[in-house]
Amino acid sequence: MKNILPFLTRIPIKGDFEKARRELWAFPLVSVFTSPLPALILYLKVPLASILALLSLYFTIGLLHLDGLADWADGIMVKGDREKKIKAMKDINVGVAGIFAVVTVLMLQIYSLQLVPFYAIFLAELNSKFAMLLAMATKKPLGKGLGAYFMEALDRNQLLYGTLIYLLLYIPVIIAEPRNLVSFLGLFIGLYAVKISLDNFGGLNGDCIGAVAEITRVGTLVVITLGWRI
């Protein structure tokens, strides 16, 4: 899976672009690499732990998905036909909707991380990466970018292996603490973002998949917060 890591993280290793297409099954496994540092910060309960944990997460994964969320939100909020929405999403300038979406996602994550178990960030990242895989499984690319290139290579075997890895990582956490089962709802929040993308744009590109990743992560943290506090 070393070839897929450079596409989803800032971990300084070299990956082969063509080989990465054959490692899409490893998307859920990437959460094992992206969540330990923020989880450790939360576990140690250092001052401003939730802020530092989130900063460490984005230091690890980069800001590409967050940028995609901003572009996605701009496209979603534009009134008009599909062409206008796609044009707004591809505009290099970030609009008010994009800024609002990014700020909202960041604030919800910071707030939620103060109220959930330290390992909740792992569940959130696991759901986030699996939701990206499910988004690509729609096989409805928008344009001919990286998203389309990966979708073309995603077959049933890769999807099956990715699902098995997701379950192998997810189930032990649920067995250890059944209340964490509520986190599964976060995955459906991400899938709803996929539906919104298809309804508005007719397909998915890298921005859409990045938005799905961000929305799934924050959605998972929010539902875990509600599950543990109600």
Curated annotation (Swiss-Prot):
Major place of residence: membrane
Annotated S-S bridges: none
Pfam families in UniProt: CobS
Topology of the protein relative to the lipid bilayer: Multi-pass membrane protein
Enzyme Commission code: 2.7.8.26
Obligatory cofactor(s): Mg(2+)
Cellular localization per UniProt: Cell membrane
The protein's annotated pathway: Cofactor biosynthesis; adenosylcobalamin biosynthesis; adenosylcobalamin from cob(II)yrinate a,c-diamide: step 7/7
Entry GO CC: plasma membrane
Keywords annotated in UniProt: Cell membrane, Cobalamin biosynthesis, Magnesium, Membrane, Transferase, Transmembrane, Transmembrane helix
Gene Ontology molecular function: adenosylcobinamide-GDP ribazoletransferase activity; cobalamin 5'-phosphate synthase activity
Catalytic activity from the UniProt record: alpha-ribazole + adenosylcob(III)inamide-GDP = adenosylcob(III)alamin + GMP + H(+); alpha-ribazole 5'-phosphate + adenosylcob(III)inamide-GDP = adenosylcob(III)alamin 5'-phosphate + GMP + H(+)
HAMAP family the UniProt entry points to: CobS
Protein task: Joins adenosylcobinamide-GDP and alpha-ribazole to generate adenosylcobalamin (Ado-cobalamin). Also synthesizes adenosylcobalamin 5'-phosphate from adenosylcobinamide-GDP and alpha-ribazole 5'-phosphate.
The family this protein is said to belong to: Belongs to the CobS family.
Protein name: Adenosylcobinamide-GDP ribazoletransferase
Organism annotation: Pyrococcus horikoshii (strain ATCC 700860 / DSM 12428 / JCM 9974 / NBRC 100139 / OT-3)
